[in-house]
Amino acid sequence: MDKIVTRFAPSPTGYLHIGGLRTALFNYLYARANGGKFLLRIEDTDLARNSMEATKAIIESFEWAGLDYDGEVVYQSQRFDLYKTYIQQLLESKKAYYCYMSKEELDALRKEQEKNKQTPRYDNRYRDFTGIPPQGIQPVVRIKAPLEGNIEFEDGIKGQISINAKEIDDFIIARSDGTPTYNFVVAVDDALMGITDVIRGDDHLSNTPKQIIIYNALGFALPRFFHVPMILNSQGKKLSKRDGAMGVMDYAKMGYLPEAILNFLVRLGWSYGDKEIFSLEEMLELFNPNELNSSPSAYNEDKLLWLNQHYIKYMDNTLLEQLLGHFGVTKLSESKREILYPALKDRSNTLVSFAQGFNEVMNAPCSYDEKMRIKLDANATQWLNELCKNLNMASWEDNPNIIESYLHQFALEHQIKIGKLMPTLRCALLGKSGGIGVCEALAVLGIEESMRRIYTFIGYQNNI
C-alpha cells in the first residue's frame, strides 16, 4: 500500500462543528495509524463569506482536541494562479471550453425543460462551438463530461457506486470572473497534495462523480473514497444546535474534555466489539475506516456526559486543577485537593459542574435550604455550640476518617443520634442537602472556617 495521506478541508464560513471534528478524527486516525500524513486545508475560495475568526476557531479546535497536522496549512485562496494554470491546460487540450450563455438564456432553458418535465441541465450548445463569440458576455468555463457510459468508483463504506453519465452535464469549473469552482479546486488540490484517501461526510457523495471527471481529464490518479453517514438527532433528523451541532470550542466552554469528545465521536459510526472507552492510543491501534457503519449515527448527550464524567473521574488531580483554573477554581493545598477532588469527581459530569460543586463547598452559604432547616432537631443549636467548644480544644486533623470517628464519639458522649447530627452540620456548613460528605467538608474547610460557618448558622437560627 502507498503511504497514506489524508486531509481535512473545512470552509471557514462558520465554526467547526462536532460533525466536522469527527471527520477530522477519522482522517487523523487512519493516517497516523499507518505512518502516513494528515494535512489541513482551508477551503476559503468563497471570499464573500470567509471569516478569519472562523479560520482561527478551526485551528484552535484542532489544538484543543490534540489533533496535530503535518506541514503548513494550505489556503485555497492563495492558489488561484495555480488553478488557472490547470483550467488553461484543459482548455488547450479541448477537454474544457468557454460557454457564452447569458443568465437569461440559462433561465429560459431551465423553464422550458421544467415545462416539458425534463431535469434542468445545460444543453451543451457551446461544447463544440467554433463560431464567433457573442459580444458583451463574460464566458464561464465548462468541462466536457462523458456523454455515455457510467462513472464508477468503489466507496470504502457504501461499496460500488455507479452513476449514469447522462445524469451529469458539462458543469462549470471557472466562473465568468475567472474564479474556479468548488469541485475543481478540491480535485486539483487533493491530487497535488498527494491525498490517497478521502474520508468525508456523505453529503459530499454527489460531488464525487464530478471530481472524478476532473481527475480523469487532468490525468490524475483517483484516491480511495469513504463517505461517512451523517450524525442525526434522537428523532432521526439532521442535527441542530439544540441537539448538539455547536462549535467545538462551545463544548470546551461547557466543560467537556477533549478526550471525552474524541471518544464520543469515534463511536459515532465505528465500534470495536462492545468496548466503549477508547484512549487515543487505542483508537490509533484499532480504527479502520473500512469498518465504518453505512447507517447514520444518533447523537446521545447522556452518553457524552457519561464519558466526560469517566474522564474527569480518572484524570490526575494536578492536571484537573490546571484545567479548572479556566472555570474560576482556585488552587488548594495538595492535602485538601486530594480530599475534595475525589469527592467532587463522582458528582461532576463537566468541568462546569465540578467548578459549581467546588464553589458550593468553598464559598460560605448565603442562605439555608428551608425544607432541610425546619426538619432539624429542636436542640440543633445546642449541639452545635457544644461541638464548637469541643472542636476548639480538639487536635484538628485534615483527615475525614479521623473527623468521622471524632463526630461519632461526640454523638455517643452527648447521647445524640449521628443521623441527626450530620444533617445539622451539613446545613450549617453547606446550606443544603446533597453534595460532598460532612467529614470531607470539615477537613477541607479547616477548623477556623468550619467554626465560623457553624456560629453564623447558630446566629441565623436564634434570630428566627
Swiss-Prot record:
Q: Which gene encodes it?
A: gltX1
The answer, when asked if Membrane is one of the entry's keywords, is no
Query: What does this gene product do?
Result: Catalyzes the attachment of glutamate to tRNA(Glu) in a two-step reaction: glutamate is first activated by ATP to form Glu-AMP and then transferred to the acceptor end of tRNA(Glu).
For this protein, the record's SUPFAM superfamilies field holds:
An anticodon-binding domain of class I aminoacyl-tRNA synthetases (SSF48163), Nucleotidylyl transferase (SSF52374)
Molecular function in Gene Ontology: ATP binding; glutamate-tRNA ligase activity; tRNA binding; zinc ion binding
Under what name is this protein listed? Answer: Glutamate--tRNA ligase 1
According to the UniProt entry, where does the motif 'HIGH' region sit in this chain?
10-20
Domain of life per record: Bacteria
| Location of the motif 'KMSKS' region | 238-242
Organism the protein comes from = Helicobacter hepaticus (strain ATCC 51449 / 3B1)
Q: Which family does it belong to?
A: Belongs to the class-I aminoacyl-tRNA synthetase family. Glutamate--tRNA ligase type 1 subfamily.
Q: Which NCBIfam families match?
A: gltX_bact
